[in-house]
Swiss-Prot record:
PANTHER family: 2-C-METHYL-D-ERYTHRITOL 4-PHOSPHATE CYTIDYLYLTRANSFERASE, CHLOROPLASTIC
Pathway: Isoprenoid biosynthesis; isopentenyl diphosphate biosynthesis via DXP pathway; isopentenyl diphosphate from 1-deoxy-D-xylulose 5-phosphate: step 2/6
EC number(s) from the headed UniProt entry: 2.7.7.60
Organism whose genome encodes this protein: Phocaeicola vulgatus (strain ATCC 8482 / DSM 1447 / JCM 5826 / CCUG 4940 / NBRC 14291 / NCTC 11154) (Bacteroides vulgatus)
Name of the gene this protein is made from: ispD
GO biological process: isopentenyl diphosphate biosynthetic process, methylerythritol 4-phosphate pathway
Protein name: 2-C-methyl-D-erythritol 4-phosphate cytidylyltransferase
Amino acid sequence: MNRHVIIVAGGKGLRMGGDIPKQFLPVGGKPVLMRTIEAFYAFDSSMHIILVLPVSQQAYWKDLCETYHFALRHDIADGGETRFHSVKNGLAYVKGEGLVGVHDGVRPFVSREVIAGCYEAAQTKQAVIPVIDVVETVRHLTKPGSETVPRNDYKLVQTPQVFEVQLLKEAYQQEYTDAFTDDASVVEAMGREVCLVQGNRENIKLTTPFDLKIAEVLI
């Protein structure tokens, strides 16, 4: 079965507090985005990798690839106005049947086991997302104040989120709404169920300077 992955890297990295978008920042001497691509290539060297980048960042990425002698094969799609539109642009590069994952470009520490688990489960479940347990106490904000909620009723969602190709393409024909916070929410809007599989806690989304410090430890 053909495997594809759309790696979305359209963030400006404003919470990092610097001028360089977070997906290009070095971790362990190599840009984050290269490590993310390598994680999927290590799982399946024949996987079709589609990188979604804003047009304004594509020349910079190509320069980085030359500087770091990064030659892993991948297509580049144009980033859109929102994540939804970026994924939709990436889907245009996916041909035929098979499975397609969507992964955050700034999650370089996804494990081989999680990638394998998502794609394997999607062969029968068609829509799969990795999750991890909530370990902190969770409070729900209300008009009077806040209240504790049972944390066992909640999960933290990660990527890659993996789907049967035609299912995800059909889902992305829907009109965009701001309720679409990830790919699972787009598929669920059609009334389809999403299967949960175990993620890995190291699969953090690098968003803040503190996250980069954690990343250096994880290398």
